[in-house]
Amino acid sequence: MGQKVHPEGFRLGVRRKGEKVDFKSQWYSDRDFAELLGEDLKIREHIERKLARAGIAEIEIKKAAEQGEVVVDIHTARPGIVIGKGGSEVDALRRDLERLTSKKVQVNVREVSRPELNAKLVAESIAEQLEGRAAFRRTMKRALTSAMRSGAVGARIQCSGRLGGIEMSRSETVSEGKVPLHTLDADIDYGFKEANTQMGQIGVKVWINHGIHTDEER
C-alpha cells in the first residue's frame, strides 16, 4: 500500500542549491522544549497574520541558549512591505515579537529574487486568485507556464475541493516536465496553501523541480 511522506521532512539533511536542507527552527533544549516550541508557533502565527500580503516564503527561527536572544529570518518576495518606510514596519514587528516572547528579538529580512520558482509563493498566489473567484484551471495553467518559463525543470500543481462550485469535492492536477518525488538527488521545492472560498476550502499543492544535484554540489 502506498504511503505519503512530507516532501520537506523527507529531504532533511539533503543539499539543495548548495546548502543543506535544515529545520526551520534551530535551537536545542533539555527541559523547556514544549515551551520553546509553543513560542515558535506564536511567532510564526503572528508574522503570517500581520504580513499576510507580503509574500512570505519562509520563516527561520534561531535561538541562542546563553543570551536568550531570538533571531528571526523572514524570506519574502516583497521586502518593502515588511520593512516599511524608514524601517518603521520591521521595527514595529520586532517590538511585537519582543512583547510576545519577553526576549530580545532580531529580525532579518531577506528577499526572494524569483518568486515564480518558490513553491510556497506560487501556492499562495493561486489561493489568492481562487479566493477572488478566478477560474481554477486557467489559474493553475498560468502558474505552471510561468514556473517553466523561469527555468524550472518540472512543475506539478494540484487543487482539491469543491472546484468550480460542484457539490462533490475532487482533485485536479496539471504538470509539465519532470517531478521525481522519490529521488533525493532532485531539488524539489514544495508548497501548500488553503484557499477559503464561498464554496468551502480548496487545498493548493505545488511541487517545483529545480534539477538534479551534481557531485560538485554535494
From Swiss-Prot:
InterPro entries found in the cross-reference section: KH_dom, KH_dom-like_a/b, KH_dom_type_2, KH_sf_prok-type, Ribosomal_S3_C_sf, Ribosomal_uS3_bac-typ, Ribosomal_uS3_C, Ribosomal_uS3_CS
Residues that span the membrane, as ranges: none
Keywords: Ribonucleoprotein, Ribosomal protein, RNA-binding, rRNA-binding
Domain KH type-2: 43-113
UniProt superkingdom: Bacteria
SMART domains, per database record: KH
GO molecular function, one term: mRNA binding
Pfam family of the protein (one): Ribosomal_S3_C
An example Gene Ontology CC term for this record: cytosolic small ribosomal subunit
Family per similarity comment: Belongs to the universal ribosomal protein uS3 family.
Function: Binds the lower part of the 30S subunit head. Binds mRNA in the 70S ribosome, positioning it for translation.
Subunit annotation: Part of the 30S ribosomal subunit. Forms a tight complex with proteins S10 and S14.
PANTHER family in the record: 30S/40S RIBOSOMAL PROTEIN S3, SMALL RIBOSOMAL SUBUNIT PROTEIN US3C
Protein name: Small ribosomal subunit protein uS3
